[in-house]
Amino acid sequence: MILVLLGAPGSGKGTQAGVISENYGIPHISTGDIFRKNIKEGTELGRKAKEYIDKGLLVPDEVTNGIVKSRIQEEDCSKGFVLDGYPRTNDQAEVLDKALEEMGRVVDAALNIDVPDEQVVERLSGRYMCRCGETFHKAYKKPKVEGICDKCGKELYQRDDDKAETVIERLKEYYRKTAPIIDYYSDKGILVNIDGTPMPDEVTKLIGKALEEAGF
């Protein structure tokens, strides 16, 4: 099973992709995670990606396409995978389709997690991270001590691309470049719209029901 998760920044794609990965035993491939790992390690890819991500812009196709094409050919992807954060444009979707065609495979379903803009801004601008990997939110998941991680006791920080002004720019970029991909998968007859406004557990149930109805 090969799935693509679509939706605006903050729609919960990463959370749901992780659950799908666990439930169906297929790898979760997140271009965002790949970029952040490289930024943290100070690699050349990380330096290139950071220039764009800090401004709320998409990393250029030539960088992203190569990473994904290489990743999906790895052994753990033989039974399928779930893509989160890619493809983001019609051009990327066409590159993915061609790469899969060469492997004798296709995208089975594209899940579009739909969340209103105001909820996206609230979700992202209130999110705080810890370098140990834990995530908190000033409204939905407050730490026991303000500004301190419950797990490791270190100071929390806000990602540059989660600051309110950058979130708004990310949404503009999404509508300019990424939203048209919804029509791309709709035209192929494999788009499934998911209400992303409930709590994550409820969204997971909606996705499970949709995949079951689609025969997965």
Residue positions per predicted region:
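Glycine-rich phosphate-binding loop of ATP-dependent small-molecule kinases
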Residues: M1-F216
